[in-house]
Amino acid sequence: CSESESKGGNVMDWKLKFISQENFVKHVEATIDKYGEKLESFDIKRFNKNIIDPIKLIFDKTVYQSTWEEMVGNEIFRQRDKSNNNDIGYFHQTIFQYMKNCHVPENGKEGGWDVIYENADGIQLPEGDVVHKIYVEMKNKHNTMNSASTGKTYMKMQNQLLNDDDCACFLVEAIAQKSQNITWNPTV
């Protein structure tokens, strides 16, 4: 957005109904602010904070015919990119706070759910059941769940459903291979 747009100027019609243009700009700015520390330069201590596979590094250097400087630069980029993916997850998750009846719990609170949606009038599920609360587990992409996290997520949902018969649990992929609304049947 240009500065005039962020200050309330209306260069284009704002189409999103659940969030004002001003709040959207603030949300984007908060996400960009999270990138901040990752842009600081790397020293050897910071570089070694993550465990690096030296064997893979040697293979990659040889196969890609790269210099050590290029390999270190690539590793720094990889580490930053991994952290930035978490920040994009923050963007996906916390934008729900602007949607009516949605609540984004603090990290690790309220059962560790990413989003909780409540509607006193009830929410009709595709099978016809009506519940008043939906617990959401969000994943950035379809490939972010390995078998361990699939099992953990399934057990978390199963536990919630056993303790609250007036709810449903949804697994939401922010960036899915294709848009779908299906029952999740994990293989654990």
Regions found by a protein language model. Name each.
Residues N140-V188:
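Catalytic cores of nucleic-acid endonucleases
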Residues C1-F91:
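Interdomain/boundary linker segments immediately adjacent to catalytic/signaling cores
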Residues S83-G108:
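Short N-terminal edge-element motif at the start of the domain
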Residues E106-N107, P126-E127, N159-N163:
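Short, conserved, surface-exposed binding loops centered on an aromatic residue
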Residues K7-V11, Y117, N185-V188:
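Short, intrinsically disordered, charge-balanced linker/junction segments flanking boundaries
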Residues G108-W113, S147-S149:
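Basic, glycine-/proline-tolerant helical and adjacent loop/strand elements
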Residues D33-F47, H132-Y154:
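Generic detector of solvent-exposed, compositionally biased contiguous segments
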Residues K100, D114-M145:
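Conserved catalytic cores of phosphodiester-cleaving nucleases, focusing on short active-site segments
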